[in-house]
Amino acid sequence: MSRVAKAPVAIPAGVEVKLNGQEITVKGAKGELTRVLNDAVVIAQEENNLTFGPKEGAANAWAQAGTARALVNNMVVGVTEGFTKKLTLKGVGYRAAIKGNAVGLTLGFSHPVEHELPAGIKAECPSQTEIIITGCDKQLVGQVAADIRSYRQPEPYKGKGVRYADENVRTKEAKKK
């Protein structure tokens, strides 16, 4: 039985929630998000709270209800506060710059890398070695950050590459003669 599903999701002022069967739409100051939830989940809206529960007879209904509650809570937080991921570039000549709706990266390849940003995602570069990605969809913000990081992951000997700001890269010792 999911303990996560038992806690209701509070709907703050300024956030509008629409239920249409299993489709839920959350609209707030930072944007609008829509998601279709699993059929094994029952959603009920009571004043300023959303409650989740299992549908009778479904095998993994409590697990699905907990997942649905976490996803909807992230939607509510996203449209009110938004989500942020910070990336740092470490390495000689590694640079980042915003070019329209894309992030231009110089990562030691023979060519510059252009990463196109999807709709609803914003990026900024406070310095040449920092990228801050913001948006209201937690999954999409994390995916864009992971895609940018995948161009040049931190290598284990010197730690050069693109890393999350809070990431701790374990370095190996070089081979001795």
Curated annotation (Swiss-Prot):
Q: Which SUPFAM superfamilies match?
A: Ribosomal protein L6
The record's annotation in Pfam families points to:
Ribosomal_L6
Keyword Ribonucleoprotein, does the record have it? yes
Q: Which InterPro entries match?
A: Ribosomal_uL6-like, Ribosomal_uL6-like_a/b-dom_sf, Ribosomal_uL6_a/b-dom, Ribosomal_uL6_bac-type, Ribosomal_uL6_CS
Q: For this chain's UniProt record, which GO biological process terms are given?
A: cytoplasmic translation
GO CC entries: cytosolic large ribosomal subunit
Q: Which GO terms describe its molecular function?
A: rRNA binding; structural constituent of ribosome
**Which keywords fit this entry according to its UniProt record?**
Ribonucleoprotein, Ribosomal protein, RNA-binding, rRNA-binding
Domain of life where this protein originates: Bacteria
Similarity-based family: Belongs to the universal ribosomal protein uL6 family.
Its biological purpose is as follows:
This protein binds to the 23S rRNA, and is important in its secondary structure. It is located near the subunit interface in the base of the L7/L12 stalk, and near the tRNA binding site of the peptidyltransferase center.
- Assembly and oligomerization: Part of the 50S ribosomal subunit.
Q: Output this protein's name.
A: Large ribosomal subunit protein uL6
